Amino acid sequence: MEEYYMKLALDLAKQGEGQTESNPLVGAVVVKDGQIVGMGAHLKYGEAHAEVHAIHMAGAHAEGADIYVTLEPCSHYGKTPPCAELIINSGIKRVFVAMRDPNPLVAGRGISMMKEAGIEVREGILADQAERLNEKFLHFMRTGLPYVTLKAAASLDGKIATSTGDSKWITSEAARQDAQQYRKTHQSILVGVGTVKADNPSLTCRLPNVTKQPVRVILDTVLSIPEDAKVICDQIAPTWIFTTARADEEKKKRLSAFGVNIFTLETERIQIPDVLKILAEEGIMSVYVEGGSAVHGSFVKEGCFQEIIFYFAPKLIGGTHAPSLISGEGFQSMKDVPLLQFTDITQIGRDIKLTAKPTKE
């Protein structure tokens, strides 16, 4: 039954996807005498944590009960008081934790607090599932850098447009709708200025009940972005532009007047590691890279990605000059080519979605 209750807690945690910002997804279930007496999830950044909801629901039944939590209860004061302290004061006798929190502010302290208070703590139940649930948060806490997902849609022969630049639409409506979920679960969407010029996208999540839009990140070496682009004018979501010392200072001022954040790198070209470092400093834990092909090529060349999600349509575009999924310098030797492991292959309508992650095996 321990795995059953933890699985329920994991399912509850998913309710907060796309809404907890820099906080992890957490679910909690309180059980007493074989009966569930409390449940909760962290649903929105700044609001009550999962343990708070579950214990408040349990009320007096929390005394002598067990609680199942998908991540180690916090031990510090942040937007809310520490959950470990709440658990201690509630009279709960046993705590089942899927995994420890690598956040330096927690990192075992929550577990230590509860043990010192005489509470029995068991760890590791469905730890792998808990790890997958919060892979973006955990990657950020362990590396100090955002979790990067590369997304693209292409024909079966790997083309993202015809030789004339026509790309609407390669994949089906079902595939395009599926891709929207990842805009919701990432804190930022990143594209090159070429994509802005070609498609004039809004780069927003169009799913219902989205409480906060992801930050729109544009890579633009010489600040050539059109000033009437949607990402500049619509004010729906924040827009951040990374440029270089080659950018026009007057244009910077005009864009800033629109509320655009300009980050100027002191280099001739935009270096992906520099961009990711700055995004991390700004609190961005996850980046959804939508292209174009040169941008994808830069991320791949630098090894700056944790996951790819590619949609393939059963179409053959052909053409030497039709753009491919990934362009740029590429690799000169096969020994340098990154090896990926497929983690999911799904058919969506007539299209195929491939998900893969880098592996050393």
From Swiss-Prot:
CDD domains: Riboflavin_deaminase-reductase (cd01284). Homotetramer. SUPFAM superfamilies: Cytidine deaminase-like (SSF53927), Dihydrofolate reductase-like (SSF53597). It catalyses: 2,5-diamino-6-hydroxy-4-(5-phosphoribosylamino)-pyrimidine + H2O + H(+) = 5-amino-6-(5-phospho-D-ribosylamino)uracil + NH4(+); 5-amino-6-(5-phospho-D-ribitylamino)uracil + NADP(+) = 5-amino-6-(5-phospho-D-ribosylamino)uracil + NADPH + H(+). Its EC number is 3.5.4.26, 1.1.1.193. GO terms for biological process: riboflavin biosynthetic process. Residues 1-122 form the CMP/dCMP-type deaminase domain. PANTHER family: 2,5-DIAMINO-6-RIBOSYLAMINO-4(3H)-PYRIMIDINONE 5'-PHOSPHATE REDUCTASE, DIHYDROFOLATE REDUCTASE FAMILY PROTEIN (AFU_ORTHOLOGUE AFUA_8G06820). Binds 1 zinc ion. Zn(2+) binds at residues 49, 74, 83. Its cofactor is Zn(2+). This is Riboflavin biosynthesis protein RibD. One of its GO terms (molecular function) is 5-amino-6-(5-phosphoribosylamino)uracil reductase activity.
